């Protein structure tokens, strides 16, 4: 088995068929599609069973609701492919994408993580495309800083060597799980490659956590950013490094406004938070 495609499913009956049709047209040999029904209550699980019927490459796992991370981890436990990738059940993958990516991986067998281009917020006024360079990065840290990877820590527009997840799991009970997990994978001294080939189509969702984040979610995002900066040995003094720290400062202001908590222990942060509060 070459590629395991893991698709968590939770109450997405309106988009699931569109998503799965984009996967089934990929025409990749040695591919399995793992549908992880995370306790859906809208008939999504039944639709998954229906679409998997008569399709040998596709299988369905029904489980109690545990959240996105738990569903992805369940898929990883079932996966048999040399490589794994994730697709959210309201998104699509452009035709020919997986064939192009697997061909590239076969020509570069030392690549551990292959990231490909993504159309962000498809169907929304903020829609744009992130077209990645065709490049093999000298180190994960160089990739992280020079590509400003914290701006595109999507789990879904990447193909991973499955063995990377032997000691890494997605964090159950947390939101912004991609920002938590991707730096941990990168910290394993991996070989990263980016490509302009293929396209992941990430649809805008008005109910997503990135749109409706509350104080708890903002706190978890800031914690994930702080952890990423530590794992990737980011320097606040570098030009690109400062961009991440600036984002962390903005998140700290959000967290302080919503919860009153100060997580960043920089000497000037408490003063900035108080000034921000007094200027509201």
Walk through the language-model features, giving the residues of each:
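Nucleotide-sugar donor-binding/catalytic module of glycosyltransferases
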Residues: 1-219
């Amino acid at each position: 088995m070459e590629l395991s495609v893991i698709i968590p499913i939770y109450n997405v009956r309106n988009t699931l068929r569109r998503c799965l049709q984009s996967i089934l047209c990929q025409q990749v040999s040695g591919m399995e599609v793992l549908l992880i029904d995370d306790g859906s209550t809208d008939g999504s699980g039944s639709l998954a069973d229906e679409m998997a019927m008569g399709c040998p490459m596709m299988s369905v796992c029904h489980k109690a609701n545990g959240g996105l991370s738990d569903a992805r981890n369940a898929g990883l436990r079932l996966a048999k492919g040399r490589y794994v990738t994730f697709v959210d059940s309201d998104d699509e993958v452009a035709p020919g994408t997986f064939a192009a990516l697997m061909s590239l991986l076969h020509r570069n067998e030392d690549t551990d993580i292959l990231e490909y281009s993504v159309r962000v917020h498809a169907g929304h006024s903020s829609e744009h495309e992130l077209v990645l360079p065709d490049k093999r990065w000298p180190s994960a840290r160089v990739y992280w800083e020079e590509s400003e990877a914290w701006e595109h820590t999507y789990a879904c527009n990447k193909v991973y060597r499955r063995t990377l997840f032997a000691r890494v799991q997605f964090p159950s009970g947390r939101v912004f799980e991609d920002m938590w997990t991707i730096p941990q994978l990168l910290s394993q001294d991996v070989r990263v490659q980016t490509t302009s080939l293929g396209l992941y189509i990430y649809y805008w969702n008005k109910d997503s956590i990135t749109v409706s984040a509350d104080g708890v979610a903002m706190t978890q995002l800031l914690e994930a950013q702080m952890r990423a900066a530590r794992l990737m040995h980011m320097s606040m003094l570098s030009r690109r490094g400062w961009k991440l720290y600036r984002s962390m400062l903005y998140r700290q202001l959000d967290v302080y406004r919503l919860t009153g908590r100060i997580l960043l222990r920089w000497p000037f942060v408490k003063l900035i938070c108080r000034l921000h509060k007094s200027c509201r």
